[in-house]
Every structure is written in structure tokens, then in C-alpha cells.
UniProtKB/Swiss-Prot annotation:
Domain Radical SAM core per the UniProt entry, residue ranges: 80-297
A Pfam family this chain is assigned to: Radical_SAM
Co-factor: note: Binds 2 [4Fe-4S] clusters per subunit. One cluster is coordinated with 3 cysteines and an exchangeable S-adenosyl-L-methionine.
SMART domains: Elp3 (SM00729)
Catalytic reaction list: [[Fe-S] cluster scaffold protein carrying a second [4Fe-4S](2+) cluster] + N(6)-octanoyl-L-lysyl-[protein] + 2 oxidized [2Fe-2S]-[ferredoxin] + 2 S-adenosyl-L-methionine + 4 H(+) = [[Fe-S] cluster scaffold protein] + N(6)-[(R)-dihydrolipoyl]-L-lysyl-[protein] + 4 Fe(3+) + 2 hydrogen sulfide + 2 5'-deoxyadenosine + 2 L-methionine + 2 reduced [2Fe-2S]-[ferredoxin]
Any one cellular-component term (Gene Ontology): cytoplasm
Species name: Enterobacter sp. (strain 638)
The protein's name in its UniProt record: Lipoyl synthase
Top EC class of this enzyme: transferase
Residues binding [4Fe-4S] cluster 2: C94, C98, C101
Length: 321
């Protein structure tokens, strides 16, 4: 029997080590059991990677993180090549251990008090007009990291007054009142929080999270700021059905959410949850039609869609697939 892992502060636990810390049993996927990727899931990498390396260098220079890299996003090459990135604040170690996610788990160090200024300067240097700020979960902080979000928003707006800011926030488990008090005082231009999947598979997919809690977070922010769009996203391919996805869409509309993203789940490693199915582009188109009929102002639905994928276009209501 292997010895239990004793977490050390500041150490990233990934793949097998991360999965060993999850209370929900997950069987390692053997290579022969992996679903073969269909043709529509194949990505063509850009021939020139200089822009990609430039963004990575800027991140390293300023001690910043992107969720694009930390979560192994399949769109990294496309987005970096177009000069866009989703910044991940509060470090690169998450206090949660969701078995679909490639972000490292562990005991994080204290937040970097200089991060808001470094982030704001980097964004100004890149001359960005739209930026997405997300974070790891920080259950170790009394406000779940809400004040750090607010500090980042304020610093960014001071250096880039005309910029649009979207926040993709964690669920602030057990800290909703405190977090919302802070965030409603310094609101973003778009408030995003992902449900990730359907309630039936939450125990397996999002251990430690609560479906109704997440809906309430979205609803309460919307009540405080009726004119600010709220947004949520789901991954498909984790054992849910299309009918269950559509029911979640109805729940989101009942809680005031107006923007939706649906994308295909991809297994980061064989230690993570396996892909149960690949949803076809036609099925994504059908779910988008359902979403628009329900009253969503925008729905980005497609195999490679992620919450922050072409987020500026999503906010303008432009077509994203």
C-alpha cells in the first residue's frame, strides 16, 4: 500500500498525486480504453509560434499565470497567437481537487500583494481592450479571494480606463455574503461562474462544490447589478445527457443568467476523468438553438468553446463556435 501524500505548502500536486488526494474513486484510464478523437476534435497548430512564446515570456517576467497554460486549454495556441490570454490570479495552486481539471492542487502560499499592479501593467503593455480574470479556488482565505479580485479590477481600470473586464470567479463556498459585498462594490463588466456539468454527476465531477450554491451566487450578483451580464459554462462528455444539459440551461435562465458557453470535455491525462462521449458540432448547434429560444442573449456552443474563448466576441454577441 502506498503511503498517503502529506501536502507541503507551495508544492503543486498533479495527475496521479492530485487524484490520490480526491475522496471520489477514479480508475486510471488504460490507453486501449480511451475514446478515439473524431476528426472535428483535431487542432491545427500555427506555423509561427513567436507570438505564443512572447506572451509566455511576458507572463514569466511578471510572475503571472494564465489559466490557458495551467489548465492545458486546447485553444492556447490560437488565443496566444492572437495576442489574448486569460489571467489566473491568486497563484497556480488550487485548494480544490476536481478530477476533470489540470490545475495543480495543494496548499497555496499567501497571495502576492503586488499582483494587482503587475497584472495591470502587463495588460496595459499588451494594449488589451478586453480581459478575462479568473483564479484558483482559495478556501484558505476568509473572503475566498474576493478582495484580491476587486484590487485587480481597480488596478486594471486605473491603468486602462476604457478596458472591459470579465471575471470568472470560484464559488466562494461558505463565504458568499462576504465575497458578494466586496465584488458588488467593485463590479466587473461581465460576471462569470461556471456550473461545469449537471447536478447528477456533481459528486464525481465537482467534489466539494454544490450546484444550488453556484446558482445562488449567480442570482445574487445579478440581483445586485441587474444591468451587468452574468455568464456560466458547462463541459459535455462527462456522463450527462443532452436533455440534462438543457435542463441546466433552464435553471440558469431562472436565475437570471444571460450568457452561456458549452464545450467538449477533454481528458488532461489518463489519471483524470475519462471522456464518456464526443458531442458532434450538429448537436452543439441544436443546443445553441435551444438556448437562444430560452432567452439567452448569447450562447457560444462548440467542441472547442471554453468560458473565455473569444470572450470579447461573446460579450458583443458575435458568433463563436
Amino acid at each position: 500500500m502506498s503511503k498517503p501524500i502529506v501536502m507541503e505548502r507551495g508544492v503543486k500536486y498533479r495527475d496521479a498525486d492530485k487524484m490520490a488526494l480526491i475522496p471520489v474513486k477514479n480508475v486510471v484510464t488504460e490507453r486501449e480504453a480511451l475514446l478515439r478523437k473524431p476528426e472535428w476534435m483535431k487542432i491545427k497548430l500555427p506555423a509561427d509560434s513567436s507570438r505564443i512564446q512572447g506572451i509566455k515570456a511576458a507572463m514569466r517576467k511578471n510572475g503571472l499565470h494564465s489559466v490557458c497554460e495551467e489548465a492545458s486549454c486546447p485553444n492556447l495556441a490560437e488565443c496566444f497567437n492572437h495576442g489574448t490570454a486569460t489571467f489566473m490570479i491568486l497563484g497556480a495552486i488550487c485548494t480544490r481537487r476536481c478530477p476533470f481539471c489540470d490545475v495543480a492542487h495543494g496548499r497555496p502560499v499567501a497571495p502576492d500583494a503586488n499582483e494587482p499592479l503587475k497584472l495591470a501593467q502587463t495588460i496595459a503593455d499588451m494594449a488589451l481592450r478586453y480581459v478575462v480574470i479568473t483564479s484558483v479556488d482559495r478556501d484558505d482565505l476568509r473572503d475566498g479571494g474576493a478582495q484580491h479580485f476587486a484590487d485587480c479590477i481597480s488596478a486594471i481600470r486605473e491603468k486602462s480606463p476604457s478596458i472591459k473586464i470579465e471575471t470568472l470567479v470560484p464559488d466562494f463556498r461558505g463565504r458568499m455574503d462576504r465575497a458578494l459585498e466586496i465584488l458588488t462594490a467593485t463590479p466587473p463588466d461581465v460576471f462569470n461562474h461556471n456550473l461545469e456539468n449537471v447536478p447528477r454527476v456533481y459528486r464525481q465531477v465537482r467534489p466539494g462544490a454544490d450546484y444550488n450554491w453556484s446558482l445562488k451566487l449567480l442570482e445574487r450578483f445579478k440581483e445586485a447589478h441587474p444591468h451587468i451580464p452574468t455568464k456560466s459554462g458547462l463541459m459535455v462528455g462527462l456522463g450527462e445527457t443532452n436533455a440534462e444539459i438543457i435542463e441546466v440551461m433552464r435553471d440558469l435562465r431562472r436565475h437570471g443568467v444571460t450568457m452561456l458557453t458549452l464545450g467538449q470535455y477533454l481528458q488532461p491525462s489518463r489519471h483524470h476523468l475519462p471522456v464518456q462521449r464526443y458531442v458532434s458540432p450538429d448537436e452543439f448547434d441544436e443546443m445553441k438553438a435551444e438556448a437562444m429560444a430560452m432567452g439567452f442573449t448569447h450562447a457560444a456552443c462548440g467542441p472547442f468553446v471554453r468560458s473565455s474563448y473569444h470572450a470579447d466576441m461573446q460579450a458583443k454577441g458575435e458568433e463563436v463556435k
